Amino acid sequence: MARASSSSGPLPPLANVPSSWAQPVGAGEERDEGRRGGLGLLAAVSVPCPDFSRQPWAPASASGPMPFALQRLRATLLRLHREREQLLRARDCARHLQAVVRLLRSGSSAGSLSLQQLHGDLQLCPSRGAALRLGFPGSRETLLLTRPVGLAAQHLEAAIEMQLRSLGRTPASLGLTSQLAELLLALPFYHTLQGHSLNFVPGAARPFPAARVLQLLAAERGCQVADKLAEARGGSGLQEQLRRQCEQERELLPGLLGLVGGVASTDSSGLRLGGPGALWSQYWTLLWAACAKCLDLRVGPWEDPRAMAQELSQALCQAPLPQECEKELLSLCHSLFHQSVICSWDQGFCQALGSALGGQSSPASLSPTSELLQRLFPPLLDSLRQPRPELRLCPPAGPTPVALGLCTLQTTLLWFVGRAQQHLAAWDPGSFLLLLQKDLPPLLSAVEALSSLASEAALTLEVEQQLGLEIHNLTEKMQLLPKESLGLFVQECHKQATQGFKLHMPRGRYWRLRLCPEPPSDPSEYARIVVYSVLEPVLQGLQGLPPEAQAPALGQALTATLGAWLDHILTHGIRFSLQGALQLKQDFGVVREVLEQEQWGLSQELRQTLLSLSIFQQLDGALLCLLQQPLPKNPVHRRPPRCCLCYEVQTTELPTSSLNSLENLAPPLRLGVSPAQNTHLLSTLGGGGRGGGGGGGPGPSPEAYLVGNQQAWLALRLHQHPRWHLPFFSCLRTSPEP
């Protein structure tokens, strides 16, 4: 500014004239000139007048009023003087901006310009107080000057940051240290400009404290290290490259940290980094954190993050590295492993959801959905077994393994319950039993392992602890699925059998027929229809399973079917004659007939186990109740009729309060029937056996046949009380079994 003013030469000061000369006319002239000159003249009016204490250039003895022409000349000179001052200051500001532009356009280091020249140019930037002293009354004129200064500070910040990043990408050498020292020496001058620009445009530029310089250098050098490590993948090259990069950084660090430490000591506004040890540790942490971040970005969807994590883990175990390096790279390995878990889980979960819409189980293999759900658990279990880094700059992105495990468990539970209900609603017991016996056990094992690891893992976050508790609760719920599913299966078997008996089992006279010479030898058609419709799909579904897996389901199905049979008889109050009881005994034998078929492949031990169920003893007890047919209270003894073929039955009165005497129950001996036929009838009745099939061998004790509703079964017997009796014509008597 001073050089510009002296080059043009100052104008001589105007003489001090009386105020009476200038006031009335000067004010008017100033207003006239302001209207003619526009904005520039208005700005000129506000410029302070020169100092009139100096020696006047005109004679001071002038007296009297100043002529009008002289007044106009004086006002014009004052205006020109002020405009000249403004132009000089604007020229100085333009020179300053040109210097900044030259710096920005240089494209090289800050040393391409002389530091003394840069310092001088930066000092030309006026502060807010200096701008006000220029005479600008409003904010518009101030912004016209200050906005370029703020813009220059922003561009200069970008140039310095670019130079620091460029130096960070330069290979380690002595030239790198000298270039960095040259750039760091220019930072105080930049901070001066940045402080001036903040007076006009807050936030126009940011300072460069030592922490920011260190972070920029470490970020670029970390990326360079990551590129070299990525190229050295495979074999033992990764381990050697890690060792080499650590040695190179150790050689560069003393000079680099010395320069940055010097900047930190001279910069009072920056972040203090502490002593040399703190600088060293912070640089290593930033360097390897940047390296880990770049390696993470280089692993795209076309690469396997799990393989890279394994290679890095092996290299870290074999190469002696700084603590900061091991810490950050181990965190990277954990992050890559977590990414691989999320990627594999996401693919498998989508496949399982798509397969859940269909996919039926086959006797030889698991259902496709069950296999896909099982594949989701091993990666999650491996992830929970991995040791978690104690401290990471940023946790891995995406859901945690505990959250993925909870989602998998919920999906498994919903799929199993929905599929089980679907099979039972369609009465497809084969698919249901395959789901229960083949698909559920391996899923339960995986779920229990997940719950065990989730409870043992060190879950520090409160959210993870809540997720672990949810996993534990759902695991307990899934452990009850076999029992609950079997209960639903029993209910559905009972329902299907009840509907079948209600639809097909006859009532009325079918069960009240008179006793025939030959006992029934074939079961009824309804028994085959109902028993086969309920038990045959169950036996088909259990084919190929071991006996220990067949026994529970088949036993429950038999219990439900036979229980529904007995309940149907009691509910509808079907009354049985002796002939009807014998026919019911043959109908019960259909169950044994089904179990003895060779196509189902049931072992002899399993058959004996099934036939020893308590439901078969209840069948025998009900049959014994029905076979104990009472006689009239006052029996009439008559001679055999001669006019027709009638039979007189000889019986003994049995107590009706207990069935203990049924072991000695003798069949009604018929007159006119051979002893061999009577013996056959005795064996038929006395061999009450298991399963209603007339099996040989001694039966259980009489107490085993006592049913809880004994009186209800006794009430279903057909009492033989004749309605009338004509002793003179026995052929017209009422049949005891109409």
Swiss-Prot record:
Q: Endoplasmic reticulum as a keyword?
A: no
Keywords for the protein's UniProt record, in alphabetical order = Coiled coil
Q: What is the native source organism of this protein? A: Mus musculus
Q: Name one Pfam family in it.
A: CC142_N
InterPro entries under this entry?
CC142_N, CCDC142, CCDC142_C
Chain positions covered by the region annotation Disordered: 1-34, 682-704
| Upper lineage | Eukaryota, Metazoa, Chordata, Craniata, Vertebrata
Entry protein name: Coiled-coil domain-containing protein 142
Q: Where are stretches of biased composition, namely Gly residues?
A: 685-698
Point out the coiled-coil segments of this chain. 69-92
